[in-house]
């Protein structure tokens, strides 16, 4: 049943994509291949986009992957685990229908800041107890926070490279993001079983705080961010 449902979703996606007209790829710059990757990565906007994308994704994956083990330790049934993860996934992807509009209206940095606050709220709720409703609300907020941070960091990074530099810049950004995600996957099970759910969440406040600090730092450097992004 589950595989048939996935096949149906895949077919629906193909049908939707068949009616989308994608813009033609811009021509390469005539004056060469653009700046070296090191120069692109040294830009404050790129550094903040990479840091927020990596830390936001890492925290989300760390807590999400640890949640089933933590709920099992709390003797909650598998049906509750499934419900929590379902709402977490809804929180991750449902905002995608309007996150772009929010960024256009309010700016990318404020939306990313809301993502940081949602992650912090998730941790506070998770630290308040281990009942079903606390897991449910915390993981839903974590999903929405991830959406705002990941979409925002991707949008922010678009300002840091030209079409000729796109492949290298996006490759570097994805490396930072998904290397951090992989590390968090390896660490989550070990940390939740050896340190516990409460300490895992308390420790997650550190990367959340670093993400917020990076946004504040960039905000204090308005010359590094175009006006429409503030």
What is the meaning of each model-derived region?
Residues 5-27, 214-219:
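C-terminal membrane-cytosol helix-exit motif in multi-pass small-molecule transporters
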Residues 164-195:
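A late C-terminal transmembrane helix in Major Facilitator Superfamily
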Residues 42-60, 140:
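Pair of pore-lining "gating" transmembrane helices in MFS-fold secondary transporters
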Residues 94-108, 192:
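Helix-to-loop junctions at the C-terminal end of transmembrane segments
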Residues 110-124, 205:
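Structural signature of the two symmetry-related core transmembrane helices
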Residues 22-49:
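Juxtamembrane intracellular "pre-TM" segments in multi-pass secondary transporters
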Residues 148-161:
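Intracellular juxtamembrane helix-capping segments at the cytosolic ends
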Residues 1-8, 190-208:
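A membrane-interface helix-boundary motif in multi-pass transporters
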């Amino acid at each position: 049943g589950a595989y048939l449902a996935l096949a149906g979703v895949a077919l629906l996606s193909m049908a939707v994509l068949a009616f989308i007209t994608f813009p033609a790829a811009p021509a390469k710059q005539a004056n060469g291949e653009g700046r070296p990757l090191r120069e692109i990565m040294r830009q404050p906007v790129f550094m903040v986009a990479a840091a927020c994308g990596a830390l936001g994704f890492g925290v989300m994956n760390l807590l999400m992957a640890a949640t089933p083990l933590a709920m099992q330790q709390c003797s909650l049934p598998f049906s509750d685990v499934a419900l929590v993860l379902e709402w977490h996934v809804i929180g991750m992807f449902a905002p995608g229908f309007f996150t772009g509009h929010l960024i256009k209206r309010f700016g990318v940095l404020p939306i990313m800041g809301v993502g940081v606050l949602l992650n912090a709220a998730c941790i506070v709720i998770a630290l308040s107890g281990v009942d079903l409703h606390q897991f449910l609300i915390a993981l839903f907020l974590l999903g929405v926070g991830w959406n705002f941070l990941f979409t925002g960091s991707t949008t922010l990074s678009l300002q840091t490279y030209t079409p000729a530099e796109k492949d290298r810049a996006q490759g570097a950004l994805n490396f930072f993001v998904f290397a951090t995600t992989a590390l968090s996957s390896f660490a989550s099970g070990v940390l939740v079983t050896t340190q516990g759910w409460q300490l895992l969440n308390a420790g997650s406040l550190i990367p959340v705080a670093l993400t917020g600090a990076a946004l504040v730092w960039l905000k204090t450097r308005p010359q590094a961010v175009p006006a429409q992004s503030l």
